[in-house]
Amino acid sequence: MEGRPHPAGRRDDAHQEAQEEEVVLSAGLTLGSVRVDTPVVLAPMAGITNAAYRRLCLEQATAQGGTSLFVCEMITSRGLVEGDATTRSMLVFDELEDVRSVQLYGTDPAYVGKATEILCADYGVAHVDLNFGCPVPKVTRKGGGAALPWKRSLLGEILQAAVTAAGRYDVPVTMKTRMGIDPEHLTYLDAGRIAEESGVAAIALHGRTAIQGYSGAADWDSIARLVEHVSIPVLGNGDIWEAADALRMVEQTGAAGVVVGRGCLGRPWLFRDLAAAFAGSAIATLPTLGEVRTMMHRHAELLCRHMGEERGCKEFRKHVSWYLKGFAAGGELRNSLALVSTMAELDALLAELEPDEPFPTSILGAPRGRQGSPRKRVVLPEGWLEDTDGRGVVVREDANETTGG
């Protein structure tokens, strides 16, 4: 995708300064035995970061001469160990993925350790990330996700189990977490300390609490505080909508890199911009609608290649609104695109889009994906907050549970 070069920083002075400073901000990112040229990680997102989407983002990054880390959808340790078919079906990798990266979720150290062993031994995974950031009630009510770091001892046991299992294969383990449960129950500094003591290669921090969900603004100051608190690399996450945001986060916080989630929805070319930005080039890809429809075709094509045409087209439907955000495509056409069942049908509908329509620059920097409102409370196991050292009442995760944080 060529797109049109654009100084993405025109929205405000901070963005403009970040884009205009044409300096190399990073020499890449090293996580144990894994190294990438661009210090950027694609966050695992349920139903999004399958092999097809990871391949699409990888193509964009490499087109700009960069390499990033693209993480598979989150899977559960119990599902993997017990041979759950849905879990196993998610562990599909594209032929171009030199570094196989998977996010693992679990609340039982034994299961997490065994699942890590399976990933390394049976699937050739080169990087394992552990999820301690998911804020959704179905996870936190079991003591998992963003709730688990409150139990410091349990967190340490899980991390050590994964690091020990992965260490036999020289595979680095990282963790992703949030600031805490709510402002009164913060966990991220202790989590960073425990991660470092456990031999974790890096910690990614989403600058929101569980009670915030995806609402409000991410607190980048918390990322800076964590950077000062630990000696292992810290990756910043939250409110990275443009490449300029990533540069600004690294500059303001001292983070070793960034984790990008919702910002790339319907915009896989963001990884091209990120590769350029961290190499010192002030560019932003502004594709015409014709170029966007080419990207949409490529995305659907990859989905069909990995899943078959019927399922691939169904999986593509959710992406239509993200790709067309801000463009003038009519509601009837959008609706039809969101119901496609074959590639031929998709191509016929894409042909109806006006190819010369310019990119809607008004949406640059705007949030994408789910946002919502803060939760009234975080659902936790009974008595969860009574102590920080005991296990409390951890409820075992469902074998086929999938979500993200």
Predicted regions and their residues:
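Active-site mouth loops of central-metabolism enzymes
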Residues: P39-T49, V99-V112, P149, M175-Y188
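Alpha/beta enzyme core
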Residues: E59-G65, G113-G144, L148, R152-I232
